[in-house]
Amino acid sequence: MTVAAPRRAPWITVHEPMAEGAHWIVERPDASPLRVSADIGALLSTLDGRDPASLARQLGVPWTAELVSHAVERLDGLGLIEGPNAAAPKPERRFVVVSPTTWQLRVAKADRLLAPIRPLLVRLSGHAVLFTALALLVGGLIALACQGSALGQALGAPLPLSTFALIWAGLAATTVVHEFGHGATLTHFHGRPGWFGVMLFYLTPACFCEVTDGWRLAKPSQRVSVAMAGVVTQAAVAGCAAMVASAVPGGDGKSTLLGFSVVCYLSALVNLIPFVKLDGYLALMAYVDIPHLRDRSMAEARSWLLWRLFGVRHVRSLPVWTVPFGLTCIGFPVLVLGIAAGRWSHVLLGMGLVGGVLVLLLLGYLGYLLVRGLWSLLRNAHRAGVGTARLALTAVVALSACGALLTFLEVDNDIRAGYAQDSSGVHLVLPPGTEVTAGSHVELERGGLMFSTSLGSARIGAGQTQRTTVPFSALTPFRTGVTTEGSTLPLIDVTGRLDPNGAARVRGAPMPAGTWLAHNYLLPVWHQIFGQED
């Protein structure tokens, strides 16, 4: 539809290049910014209700009234022109569901929080700050290497519950510093960070700081610096903790600092994963200078799959490496949610009916993602002209392959438990609802924050499980005098030098992957919701 007197939608902001070599950026409420050419940017800046001929005279060569009309039609289709195609944005909300795996709560505008120190951030030497941060990062790694014995004690032995609380509280505080590292770096380059807040990202609590204004920066290296600032900041904090720990005498205080340092380093490392929208992805996107890299790579990968499976014509629009990158991006969320299900399911099942429903919803969503992926592939192939018979055959082959994998791939059915000693001997401590077989081999361990150390072995004796009060530290890596409800069985043929209580692993016979999934996830959920036993 031709717009006789085009006017830019009032909620659209057009940013001129910040410096030579930078891009024109169009900012839209609750949407990703658009990068446009200089000619389109100039046109958008002049759309004030005049007719195309008047606009063409003001803009000069190469614009004509016809070119202005054609460009306005395309901009109108994007919702940038005032009129029926440009719906007014909804009021800015504090709580935003970005996707089923990302829920955000906006707390405050980061640029306002950083305003008091903005002059300092602008004047700071970027090279000096980077050198200092890298020196702390490397110095911390050297400090950890020099404290091997204390590090093993901190990561591989039970710690007080207060130590765990301090480590995770410190990690939460460091996450806030991490995000402000992004905002501070963008501010240094004369950009303006957006919202700061907290979010649930793939079932994991986290913070965020919007730095989409970084697309206005002239150099890709500046955008990479903004993306990597959080990781470098967090790793520098980890290095500080490790070096301080080297000056602290042995004990729980030293273990707290070492545990906090390692957890921070690992958190920074996880943020480098480029297959989900973490810092590593943002840095990669900035480095290759391809906006919406992940979405476009996944589209490229789907097109490549259609070509390989059905012979549908594939026109490559991105570098060849984006195909394997896109395939990994497609499958990675399923992997992350699967790990999250394994991590949280036993905790949630301990919450009763509500926890059982949550686990069921999580497993259902995992299944939905898998089915949706196959359905999307078949639907796109059908739209490209692939016959129904070939599509049906492909679906049958894919489902048969999944069935064969679940049937013939065997996994170890180990059960995590604990042990405790008293005057009557050593007993296996089981979480409620766990079933084991008499005579099964048991590894007795000392559990810690990151890993366990084998102390000995035993076998499960005959008899019925006894419901009783057990040490909480037998089921967790916490050193505490708290007790909880659990089930116990006698252990026989005990060998090794054992702690008073600790972790245990019951070695189970290998079983098909499908049976293992049902035994460890589906049946416990069924029992929790419907209260039925085998």
Please place each PLM-identified region on the residue numbering:
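Internal/C-terminal transmembrane anchor helices
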Residues: 381-413
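Long, charge-rich, low-complexity alpha-helical segments
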Residues: 30-117
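Loop-to-transmembrane boundary segments
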Residues: 118-133, 213-234, 305-335, 388-395
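Core alpha-helical transmembrane segments of integral membrane proteins
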Residues: 99-198, 240-243, 247
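Hydrophobic alpha-helical membrane-insertion signals
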Residues: 388, 406-534
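Membrane-embedded catalytic scaffold of the fatty acid hydroxylase/desaturase
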Residues: 160-314
